[in-house]
C-alpha cells in the first residue's frame, strides 16, 4: 500500500505565465461545463450516462475543430482531469444523492484551479522552480524540503480571489508504509 503526502507552496508566475494560467483555468471550466451540459441532456433523454472514455475521445476530436482549436494551447492532461472530476462527481451523486447534483462552474463562483498529473517527468522541481506543462518554469517559494524517496504524482494549481497563486503537490510515499499496509 502507498501513502500520499501533499505540500502546498506559493508560486510567483510572470505576466506571460499568468495569462497562460488564466487560459488554462478558463478552458478547464469550459470543458467541465460543456460535458456537464451534455451529461444532463443525455440523462434527461434516455436515463444513461456518458462515461469518461467517450468524453475523452470526443474531446480529442473536438480539439481538432476550428471552433475549439484554442484547447490545444493548454495542458491536455488538465482538460482530461476536469473530465475525470466531472465523472467522479456524477458517480458520487448516483451512489449518494446527499452529495448533491454536480453544478456548473462560473467565473464568479468557482475557485480558479486545475490539476495535472506527472507523466514521464513532465513536472519537476529544481533550484526553486516548478516546471509545468505548457507553462514552463515558474518561481516556487519552497519552504519545505521534500524527501528524495518521494515520487511526484500530481499538481493542483490554484488562484485565490486576491490574485495569489498556489500549487499543491501530491507525492507517493512508498517508504512510509510497512508490512500489511500499516504505518511503521
Language model regions located:
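Nucleic-acid substrate recognition interfaces
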Residues: 1-184
